[in-house]
Amino acid sequence: MTAKPPFKVIIVGGSIAGLTLAHCLSKAGIDYIVLEKRKHIAPQEGASIGILPHGGRILEQLGLFYLVEEQIEPLHTAHQYFPDGFAHTTKAPQVIYERFGLPLAFLERRRMLRALYDTLPDSSQVLVNKAVTSVEREVSDLMRVTTYDGSVYRGNLVVGADGVHSRVRAEMWRLATSQSPGVFPEHEMSAMAVEYACIFGISSSVPKLQPGEQVASFNNGRSYLTFPGKNGRVFWFLLLKLDRKYSYSNAPRFSSTDAEKRAERFADDHIWAGVNFRDLWKSKEVFSFVNLEEYLFQQWHWERIVCIGDSMHKMTPNTGQGANCAIEDAAALVNRLHRALKATPDGSSLSSGDIDDLLGEFNRARSRRVREIYQGSRMVVRLQARQNLFLKLLGRYYLPYRGEVAADAASKIIAPAEHLDFLPLATRSATGWHQFKPGQSKTLLIPFLYPVVAFSLCVLAWIGNDYLRNGVVFA
């Protein structure tokens, strides 16, 4: 009797999510292949990523976090700067480091991708220049993926780790609409929106920005984030409020000329310690100008297809959570696959019902986990761009005087994170994982918002009276 072939996962996208998933599957002994549409696994696009303790813990379980540490200057200080010249400094990054035993890390995205690729046990399982054109159901337990060059790949599960412009997501919707109408609400398929855009890049020779000290410079309708790293390099973001809210399909596209015009317009914006945006721009090595899509999809799977990472939860970069949520997605999915396959007699096959149950539970758990992170990201990008009077007051007159509110809020997000439950945890894990109890993060905003609302009502009343008397205007 011929042995049944092993369970196989087709990963579409050689992204942080996709390559982390490949590592997790490898550790679990589950077969996979990665299809990446680009010609190179780690192109230089000027992008950088933050690895927070919950993402770092999973990478450490995989034996990879040392590669991150080799590339970074750990963050220990956070500065905030406001248009009226007010500055605020905290040690929140250092506090988080001490609570969780892992630093807040910032590095080039391409270096992270290269590290993930180079350390795979068998890099021949990652194929480049393989743009997916279709995903089809073949027989009861197999899916067929076809690429632009006509190649065909078969597996038991297709995972879309192909980013915000996901082809797998589109194929999942197409198949579901034709075979199971109503599974995906029509409004959700067009709900992703764009209100912000971002010019991001890497610069060198900005000596006044010190390694390990991140800066958030608040401004009206825009904000700046800078992360000085090793060897004098600075990773930076200029986040811009657009003129209106656009749907995903109708959002404007930007060229290098558009970026040059914005850079000239905002050249005199002060960032920190005598550094203006012109100083970053004139020493740039590489940059890009992109839209910042925002949306959290509710339905992540259909039959033997599931999407993870930015294809399901796209956030702005202000909180640094995008890559970490993608890493968590990968770990959470493999935890469930590993358990399910171990429970089968042959360890190699899962019925359609098994898959549906597994993916449904994964979807529910990850949606609950990501929801507050996504909402926090939406709030922070608008807070730092001072989008309205309430957020101006909150950022300038309330939060700087709330002690460790930033570190505490981050800690309650980090602590409940999922890790690989079939691998040992690192020995350097610190007390914060237990101190900030899992399951409590969903109550975080309640005690926070009561004093915020009370404070804002008082200040609004004062501003209204003072404005009527004296015509006071706030920067």
From Swiss-Prot:
GO term, biological process aspect, one: secondary metabolite biosynthetic process
Stored InterPro entries: FAD-bd, FAD/NAD-bd_sf, FAD_mOase_fung
Domain of life: Eukaryota
Keyword annotations of the record: FAD, Flavoprotein, Membrane, Monooxygenase, Oxidoreductase, Signal, Transmembrane, Transmembrane helix
Gene disruption: observed consequences: Accumulates 2 prenylated polyketides including geranylgeranyl-triacetate lactone.
Catalysed transformations (reactions): (2E,6E,10E)-geranylgeranyl-triacetate lactone + AH2 + O2 = (S)-(2E,6E,10E)-epoxygeranylgeranyl-triacetate lactone + A + H2O
Signal peptide as annotated in the record: 1-24
Pathway in which this enzyme or protein is active: Secondary metabolite biosynthesis; terpenoid biosynthesis
Main location: membrane
One Gene Ontology cellular component annotation held by this UniProt entry: membrane
Cysteine pairs bridged by disulfides in the record: none
Molecular functions (GO terms): FAD binding; salicylate 1-monooxygenase activity
Top class in the EC scheme: oxidoreductase
Positions of FAD binding: 36, 50, 109, 310, 323
Membrane topology designation: Single-pass membrane protein
Matches recorded under Pfam families: FAD_binding_3
Biological role stated in the UniProt entry: FAD-dependent monooxygenase spyC; part of the gene cluster that mediates the biosynthesis of meroterpenoids called sartorypyrones. Within the pathway, spyC catalyzes the epoxidation of geranylgeranyl-triacetate lactone at the terminal olein to yield epoxygeranylgeranyl-triacetate lactone. The biosynthesis of sartorypyrones begins with the production of triacetic acid lactone (TAL) by the NR-PKS spyA using one molecule of acetyl-CoA and two molecules of malonyl-CoA.
Protein's UniProt name: FAD-dependent monooxygenase spyC
Organism: Aspergillus fumigatus (strain ATCC MYA-4609 / CBS 101355 / FGSC A1100 / Af293) (Neosartorya fumigata)
